[in-house]
Amino acid sequence: MIVSPHREGGQAQFIAQPVPKNTRDARINCLLDYLQQHIAEPHSLDSLARVVAMSRRTLTRHFARATGMSITDWLTAERLRRSQTLLEAGDLPVEQVAEAVGYLSAVTWRQQFKARFGVSPTEWRRTFRRGA
């Protein structure tokens, strides 16, 4: 059984849907490992298909079946999850956090972060620093 951590004082849990990291498809698992190791790099469907020796169409189908999401959605979710960790544990300026997780635009990253978690990256960092 998986239980979400509890925070005292009515603080929001900030727990979003987990990003799948392991599937029953060995080639997709290899791709997920590759993407996690190269999260900051730009990726195209063609380049990812080459990594796992699949056609674009086959990769798209296998990835969606294995993870329940598109490659783009998975990458976005993983980049946002990784940025949470950097904000909580590090002192990188916000713009550098965006770059470290593969965003070319800090503005786009901020918008996606706030849409996903309901707070700005700066507010996220402040919340977790206060609790430390």
Give the residues covered by each predicted segment:
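Short, Lys/Arg-enriched, Trp-marked, Pro/Gly-tolerant hinge/linker segments that flank
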Residues: M1-E41, S47-V52, R65-S70, A77
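Short amphipathic alpha-helical surface patches that mediate protein-protein
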Residues: I2-V3, K114, R129
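Terminal helix-turn-helix DNA-binding modules in bacterial transcription factors
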Residues: P42-S47, M54, A64-A106, R126-A132
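Short hydrophobic/aromatic patch on the recognition helix
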Residues: L59, F63, T108-W109, F113
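Nucleic acid-binding interface residues in structured DNA/RNA-binding domains
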Residues: S120
